[in-house]
Amino acid sequence: DQLVKAEIFKRDGTKETWAYTYDALGRRIGKGRLKTNQEVSETSFPHDLSGNDLENHTRFVWDGSHLLQEIHPDGRYTYIYTDQDSYEPLAQVRNRTDREGESKQEINYFHCDQIGIPREMTDKDGNLLWFGNYYGWGKLKGETNVTGTAYQPFRLQNQYADRETGL
């Protein structure tokens, strides 16, 4: 059983509908927020990975069972792990295009505890970008995005946190 649709009711009374797609191995390969008043169909959505009929579409690229990349409308995040046999993240390479149309690349580093949970994220110069505290089973207790630009989606090893649904 896989999550193919999530309806999120906001405090202001509005509703967002997110749809998810998976490959034959059960790995999530896409997620996107539907434009207002569209319906999700398991057979028709969202096979068009070019972003048609979607707002905020994300694609996922895998190397075996390792999440290799997330491709967002505003750029791409590539993940590097400590070892090919480990799910402990080491670094994140962010490629994006700035407002002037120039390509930019940032490298950020994960600082994990003894069981591979990211506790901090720093930039290439060692400046703190993000830090988090967790409950016993990997649920995020609290986080601080120091710069407001850090993106850290990992929890326990090989667990991806979907911010839209909280899963």
Placement of each model-derived feature along the sequence:
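Short, flexible loop/turn elements at secondary-structure junctions
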Residues: 10, 85, 158-160
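A motif-centric feature for acidic-aromatic and gly/ser/thr-rich catalytic loops and repeats
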Residues: 51, 92, 99-167
